[in-house]
Amino acid sequence: MEALVYTFLLVGTLGIIFFAIFFREPPRIIK
């Protein structure tokens, strides 16, 4: 049960960091 919570927190923090970096600078990789 604790492992699930830890993995959820890890994925959440990584997702927040990824979206912060993605929205901070314009997506040049897609174009």
UniProtKB/Swiss-Prot annotation:
Membrane topology recorded in Swiss-Prot or TrEMBL: Single-pass membrane protein
Transmembrane stretches, start-end: 3-23
Localization per Swiss-Prot or TrEMBL: Plastid, Chloroplast thylakoid membrane
Keyword ATP-binding (UniProt): no
SUPFAM superfamilies per the UniProt record, alphabetical: Photosystem II reaction center protein T, PsbT
Keywords: Chloroplast, Membrane, Photosynthesis, Photosystem II, Plastid, Thylakoid, Transmembrane, Transmembrane helix
Gene Ontology, cellular component aspect: chloroplast thylakoid membrane; photosystem II reaction center
Main location: plastid
Biological process terms in GO annotation: photosynthesis
Pfam family, one: PsbT
Role summary: Found at the monomer-monomer interface of the photosystem II (PS II) dimer, plays a role in assembly and dimerization of PSII. PSII is a light-driven water plastoquinone oxidoreductase, using light energy to abstract electrons from H(2)O, generating a proton gradient subsequently used for ATP formation.
Family: Belongs to the PsbT family.
Subunit: PSII is composed of 1 copy each of membrane proteins PsbA, PsbB, PsbC, PsbD, PsbE, PsbF, PsbH, PsbI, PsbJ, PsbK, PsbL, PsbM, PsbT, PsbY, PsbZ, Psb30/Ycf12, at least 3 peripheral proteins of the oxygen-evolving complex and a large number of cofactors. It forms dimeric complexes.
Name recorded for this polypeptide: Photosystem II reaction center protein T
Species this chain originates from: Mesostigma viride (Green alga)
Gene for this chain: psbT
